[in-house]
Amino acid sequence: LERNTKLNSDTIPFPARHLLPMENYIMAQESHGYSNGRWTSMISSRGCPYGCTFCASRKTRWVSRSATDVADEIEYCIEKWDIREFHFEDDNMTINVKRLIEICDEIKRRKLDITWQTPNGIRASRIDEEMLRAMKESGCEHVTLAPESGSPRVLEDIIQKGKDFDLDHLRDCGATAHKLGLKVAAYFVLGLPGETRKDMEMTISYARQLAKVGVDEVNFGLFIPLPATPLWEPSKHKIKDMDWLDLLTVGDLAKAVSFTDEVG
């Protein structure tokens, strides 16, 4: 299909949930986020302009939906299936702070009785107290931050997180979110190529700092090399026959192969 660079994302139909056995999905409670009831996933934007070297969504065009369109889909899910919990799976929901606050305002304006969360993570460099407060007031219960590492060297030289990323600011964001009554999680990646034992110890130490300021949960994931990313080196990583199932974090590759000399 020819790529339409002038596509208005608001013209794209809502996901065809009506073609799925929605009650089965709702009752299974197999969500990416923390499900407490009748839930569904949602995407308010696609893409991420940042260049994290391990990420499948790096440097992709960011396209967003309007606050009105997002609220329309929420309202539709309420009316059709009585869904009251929404898990936003955007690659980077906080690129446009003004738009995110507009979504929060639209949810409040329509008096939509919902809860929502960001299990895919939001970028701390775009967060401030005004945004977190707007999220909380519109029903957000849980935010996930993605520091990836507690080592400045890893963030700058290996992950290439971006010059605007600051670990101290992320810690402050976690403290502010906790103060406002939000549940907070933080994601880290271990085992990156070139990562040392000292780097990993710094990450663990930083995770403890987050816990002290009120972050409720920290998650450590293993690095998995993905095709078309800068860290994809099949020969170096001893990948002979590529099977996409092996590239999932739940696959055998994650258990059998280490991508740094510091971890067995």
Locate the predicted segments by residue:
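C-terminal accessory regions of radical SAM enzymes
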Residues: N4-T5, I26-E30, K198-G264
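Radical SAM [4Fe-4S] cluster-binding motif and immediate context
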Residues: F14-Y187, S205
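Short aromatic-enriched loop/helix-cap "lid" or pocket-rim segments at secondary-structure transitions
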Residues: E2, I12, L100, E130-M131, ...
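Short, solvent-exposed turn/loop segments enriched in Gly/Ser/Thr/Pro and often Arg
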Residues: E89-N96, N120-G121, L190-G194, F220-L231
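Short, well-ordered beta-strand elements within core beta-sheets of diverse protein domains
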Residues: I43, G191-L192, S258-D261
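Short, basic, helix/turn surface patches
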Residues: L1-L7, D91, H169-G181, R208-F220
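Active-site glycine- and acidic-residue-rich loops that bind
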Residues: A124-R126, G194-M200
